[in-house]
Regions:
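Acidic, proline/glycine-enriched N-terminal capping motif
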Residues: 1-6, 11, 151
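Conserved, structured C-terminal
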Residues: 19-174
Length: 174
């Protein structure tokens, strides 16, 4: 689910996507590193018995955005029958897939992005990032895929009306 993370006074600390991987297993993908520290502070204050850690160094992300993003992923993503396929994946949902076949490199694919277009994000272990990039690049050639830098991403995010901490909101925004 996409949501705001708010202080007790209602002002926004961050925005992001919260994934539920299991009964007691969640992943917060936000824009500000401090949000993880804030979650730890809240858990400590409330005496929650939880484990909160940063996974930034353990997960890489490649965004595949645009009208052909689904077709690109369908060329190399294998999904078990018990998981939603790329075609069936709804906004802010994810699946656990593999590259090419059932014993391929494990990946998580979410129907998320920062462009306002049809799009997906592929989450993988850092050791697999080059393989994932190469698969996306090869599958995207027939669609004239183009890498997108942060400046261009910022422009499409603004055009789509998507907010970013420090620009469209801060800890004084409620």
């Amino acid at each position: 689910v996409y949501t705001a993370m708010c202080y007790e006074n209602g002002c926004m600390l961050d925005d992001g996507t919260l994934f539920k991987f299991g009964q007691d297993n969640f992943r917060w993908i936000g824009g500000d590193e401090y949000s993880g520290e804030w979650l730890k502070e809240q858990a400590k204050k409330k005496n929650y018995k939880v484990w909160i850690k940063s996974a930034t160094d353990h997960i890489h992300n490649i965004a595949v955005q645009g009208p052909n993003s689904r077709k690109i992923l369908e060329k190399f993503v294998w999904t078990a029958p018990i998981q939603p396929s790329i075609t069936e994946l709804e906004w802010f949902r994810f699946n656990i897939s593999r590259i090419d076949h059932e014993t391929g490199t494990p990946i998580v694919i979410s129907r998320t992005g920062y462009t306002g277009e049809l799009g997906y994000e592929i989450w993988c272990h850092p050791k697999d990032a080059n393989e994932v990039w190469d698969k996306v690049w090869e599958a995207g050639k027939e669609f004239d895929i183009t890498p997108l830098g942060l400046e261009a991403l910022d422009m499409v995010r603004i055009e789509a009306g998507l907010i970013f901490y420090g620009y469209e909101f801060n800890d004084q925004t409620d």
